[in-house]
Regions:
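Conserved non-catalytic scaffold segment of RNase H-like nuclease domains
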Residues: 1-104
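Conserved small/polar residues in nucleotide/adenosyl-binding loops
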Residues: 106-113
């Protein structure tokens, strides 16, 4: 059994990492089987959150209105993760959004900043 890892989950504005955005990251850093740190932060999206997504996630436009932009939050999340193993319930979905968002933010000027 793993003793050190990051368990994380995302909430997004849709299902397509190329066209939708991460609006919340939640993560737990586990060391020797115990939670040692937490990372929970909203991300301010470029587009308004639809009523359908609010119904699904419970996250409203008011909740993200004062959130930091994606570049700041993703940078902090990457720093939080260090070189740990990432695990999650729907890991393929969450990892694809994280990777795609990081690539969009750090490989070219992006309107998602």
């Amino acid at each position: 059994m793993l003793k050190s890892y990051i368990a994380f989950d995302l909430e997004t504005t849709g299902l397509d990492p190329m066209n939708n955005e991460i609006i919340e990251i939640g993560a737990l850093k586990v060391r020797d089987g115990k939670v040692s740190e937490r990372f929970m932060e909203f991300i301010k999206p470029q587009e308004l959150i639809s009523p359908a997504i609010t119904g699904l996630t419970g996250i409203s436009n008011d909740m993200v209105a004062s959130a930091r932009p994606a570049r700041s939050v993703i940078t902090d999340f990457i720093d939080f993760c260090e070189e740990d193993i990432l695990i999650g319930h729907n890991i393929i979905f969450d990892y694809s959004f994280t990777k795609c968002t990081a690539c969009l933010l750090y490989t070219s000027p992006s309107p998602r900043d």
